[in-house]
Amino acid sequence: GEAVSDTIDDPVIDEIAQTPSIEVTKEASIIHQAGTDSEISAGDTIVYTVSVTNNGNVTISNINFTDDLTDGQGNVLSLTSGGPNDWGSISLAPGESQDLIASYTISQSASDSGSIINTATATGDSPQGTDDVSDVSDDPQGTTLAGDDDPTVVNTTLNPSIEVTKA
């Protein structure tokens, strides 16, 4: 007889684990109102730099942001410029970062509350669309809380005083 040979034509599939991951940090810098001292108070502007980095091994697309800004009493504030409505949706390749800028001019009532508290959240899609990726901003200069997702807090200077003159 003749030898019979048979080959298997099934391809070998090596799956590469997708690990989508983003990290968001937010830092604040102060622009003091012209002619004022270095104390943080009404009229000064807080400039927020939000940095988002793709720490995973796959591209993250449709990254959108929310931004929560409150005063020390929990009253909701609105950014003066920049923010999620201006930033739109972005995509980041593995290892890629992008900085986004927003600002808030401190109102008297926010200054009187003693602090302005800000947190950004980024949410994006993995390539398969099945794993949403999300991260809450961390203030790298702030107090580290459990999970490293601490808000960016700017404390205002409170100098209450009253002068009474009797004639």
Q: Where in the sequence are the language-model features?
A:
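Exported/extracytosolic protein signature
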Residues: 1-167
